Amino acid sequence: SEGAAIMVGTRTALLDNPSLNVRHWSGNSPVRVVLDRRLVIPDSYRLLNGFSRTLIFTEKEVENRENVEYIRIDFEGPVIRQVLDHLAARKLDSLLVEGGAQLINSFVEADVWDEARVETAPVRLYQGVHAPMLGKEAVSGISRRSVMSIKNHNYEIFNTKKHIKTWI
């Protein structure tokens, strides 16, 4: 894996039932990070199978189990900052925010991202959460690093000029 941790929100976890592990690639699987405020993800889902280390951020007090750690945070406060504080305390120095759109928007709005890998396809979606929109200030500091197209899909990598520092 290229990153220390990979994160999804509740809705993406419920809709996709992702594994968030390494497949067809060498190296260790990243730590799985899930934002599940009310603990609505069923125990039968892959994220809770205990095969890989998993951190669940929630508002509930829950006992940990094998390879699944429940971390209680205040959802009335700055959620993203709290998540990053806990990840930094665990020496997890890189985080891939897989999605969904609401979670990605939260990171963009908190201005705590330094690279975006964007995949687009010739498909128009008319429902769901809109993709992140960047304001004029954010756009002025962004550079496009590379573009690649494969079978009607475009892959782009964007970088900001800033460096994200841990909150601690």
Where are these regions (language model features)?
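Enzymes that bind and transform nitrogen-containing heteroaromatic metabolites
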Residues: 1-168
